[in-house]
């Protein structure tokens, strides 16, 4: 008696809807199921926007490009239910003028831990909820305002930041 290989949904493409509220940060994640309980992922975030450029006193931005790779552990099975994740991440950033007149730019390298829940809406559409934090080192330069260019500090510092507050829409292939 011959058996046919079973079909399983192994690939998903998702976007975090809450990232768009962060001054228009575009984002995408690709996940691939490597076993019943493990998936690997790669993600990117990009925000090129600067607001009120014509008025240095009112200018603000949350510009970034960020790249991450990681893995998720699914206690039940991939692409549905609770999950726990770890990621390695690189971020080039420039933010300022939001909470204070200062602006900071630099590069961050780090790792993060995350947890969440994935709810199946249909056989191909999932809704993901999750949160986490990441920590690492930042090579930075701080300016007195977003546009003036006067350096007030620079160097290396360690950070621990909240990350990936997410409500994501995922399409499962």
Each predicted region: which residue ranges?
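A short local loop/turn or secondary-structure capping micro-motif enriched for an aromatic residue
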Residues: 22, 48-51, 136-137
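Short secondary-structure boundary/capping segments within folded domains
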Residues: 19, 31-34, 159
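Cleavable N-terminal export/targeting peptides
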Residues: 1-10, 173
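Predominantly the C-terminal beta-signal and adjacent terminal strand-loop region
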Residues: 122-173
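Solvent-exposed loop/turn segments connecting transmembrane beta-strands
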Residues: 14-29, 47, 78
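Gram-negative (and chloroplast) outer-membrane scaffold detector with strong preference
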Residues: 32-129, 168-171
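Extracytoplasmic loops and strand-loop junctions of Gram-negative outer membrane beta-barrel proteins
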Residues: 10-13, 52-54, 96-99, 148-154
